[in-house]
Amino acid sequence: MEDDQDEEQTALVCDNGSGLVKAGFPGDAPPRAVFPLTVGRPRHQGVMVGMGQKDSYVGDEAQSKRGILTLKYPIEHGIITNWDNMEKIWHHTFYNELRVAPEEHPVLLTEAPLNPKANREKMTQIMFETFNVPAMYVAIQAVLSLYASGRTTGIVLDSGDGVSHNVPIYEGYALPHAIMRLDLAGRDLTDYLMKILTERGYSFVTTAEREIVRDIKEKLCYVALDFEQEMATAASSSSLEKSYELPDGQVITIGNERFRCPETLFQPSFIGMESSGVHETTYNSIMKCDIDIRKDLYANNVLSGGTTMYPGIADRMQKEITALAPSTMKSKIIAPPERKYSVWIGASILASLSTFQQMWITKQEYDESGPSIVHRKCF
């Protein structure tokens, strides 16, 4: 059949996080296009006379012009909230970043765990009706991270810019009743670091300065194995201090802020949240699962997402889970070095599997059944 050959075209893989878009073709390492998931619109119409001003800017261009723009993030806490802006981001991804015609490629998208049904339908509709894709599929981010680690059973802590989730997965299927969501992630940690650096006498307030603080966070922060002990060390010596050069040449020194910032993941009360830390949510999620599979979950505890990149986080997690779990349980934390991109890598693996090729939702199926087809084919 002629049509079947057509379906063999290279897939496009697009992972939309709250902070970054990761997009490309299966086999790319790292993903070909990584850019901020943001849309900027001019604050004042007609300010830039004669500069061929556009009504909107996407991604890196929006970031670089942020002085004259209002930046909007169409994904909040992992869930798409502004479809017009999201469409702009997909358009930018296909036409400007990857330079492909979406009508010629099947597209694999990712979604947050517990994504509302209406949202999945809307994603499906936009892909087929706006971008005319020949086929598409929507996969859950945490499940893809687990695949990327070479497993089909385990529990994933996926923490990005806007949201963190604990997702227990058994033989490839997420267990929705036991998923934990924590609205605490990279963006909150950047905000908290801005706050505690201000207490030290440095002032970071604007969106431009926020980017600097994010860089400080990514380069210098780490998770302490024992927070109290680390605080004592920091108080009694300067061994933990590091310096950082700002763009204007000023050098700042950062001490206990280096580990106080990510400690928030384990003690959300630092930023006034009444939630459990990521170690407790992991434990609670496992406890909501059938007693027979808990052993497999403890033994396959996979970290994923940019906010799990802090040095020391795996050891600390191991220590905390061991303290919570029954003494007979062997717990193991898996922290793959490429975990910043593991959702994307898992999606890229999935799209390449020969067994996956019959899973795509085709244009024909969409035309016959409408957007609700997504619930039957993607789960």
Swiss-Prot record:
Keywords: ATP-binding, Cytoplasm, Cytoskeleton, Hydrolase, Muscle protein, Nucleotide-binding. GO terms for molecular function: ATP binding; hydrolase activity. InterPro entries: Actin, Actin/actin-like_CS, Actin_CS, ATPase_NBD. SMART domains: ACTIN. GO terms for cellular component: cytoplasm; cytoskeleton. It catalyses: ATP + H2O = ADP + phosphate + H(+). Its EC number is 3.6.4.-. It is found in: Cytoplasm, Cytoskeleton. CDD domains: ASKHA_NBD_actin (cd10224). PROSITE patterns: ACTINS_1, ACTINS_2, ACTINS_ACT_LIKE. Polymerization of globular actin (G-actin) leads to a structural filament (F-actin) in the form of a two-stranded helix. Each actin can bind to 4 others. Belongs to the actin family. Actins are highly conserved proteins that are involved in various types of cell motility and are ubiquitously expressed in all eukaryotic cells. This is Actin, muscle. It comes from Styela plicata (Wrinkled sea squirt). The lineage of its organism: Eukaryota, Metazoa, Chordata, Tunicata, Ascidiacea.
